[in-house]
């Protein structure tokens, strides 16, 4: 088996074929996949046949799995390492990067499509990805100098409040206090600077709250222009891997009366962005 890559967008994202992720891949193949993620930031593996065990086994080849979130409801899936991205969470419709609200944020996410809804007037349930490396590169130099030293506070409660959801238990609130992350970070794999934004970012530390919120809004608007965005149209059997350290993503609307079953695993970064090289 050899990895075959076909670029899907002028600046990032690639279809990846020639490998069966349900098998015990040699380390050379895993290294090829890691290098492709560093280059393209988003990889789409079509026509995979994965169950939860094989998806989890492959994810572990790419890094330590992030700890499960505090969750008070009943879980549908057997393995707590999975996030159930099905008909459940409107918060995923906002631009975000996975687990930026954790002290040690997410690194790579792997989302597998077991079942997808039919196209509908409400939408097809695509996922959009924004390349935050290219978005940073396109900023004026004066703006780069302004934002270089800035730190934003991230909280899952802030992003959920934007869609009117505030019903967290005391245990969930205690388990997920606000955290601080760099607004501009350097990717540890390839050394390129990238914006680090999310709907979880509530304000800029040591700035007046209105000024910081407006800056965050302006940067998200800049980073999500069409020239920086790839749209993934799902098919059953697609596994998509994306690098949260240099992308944002969001889910699009779909007919929520239809079954939809997508399951995500996210690996954990090495440290808080504040503890990584600037």
In which residue ranges do the predicted regions lie?
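Non-heme Fe(II) oxygenase catalytic core, chiefly the N-lobe of the double-stranded beta-helix
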Residues: 2-239, 245-278
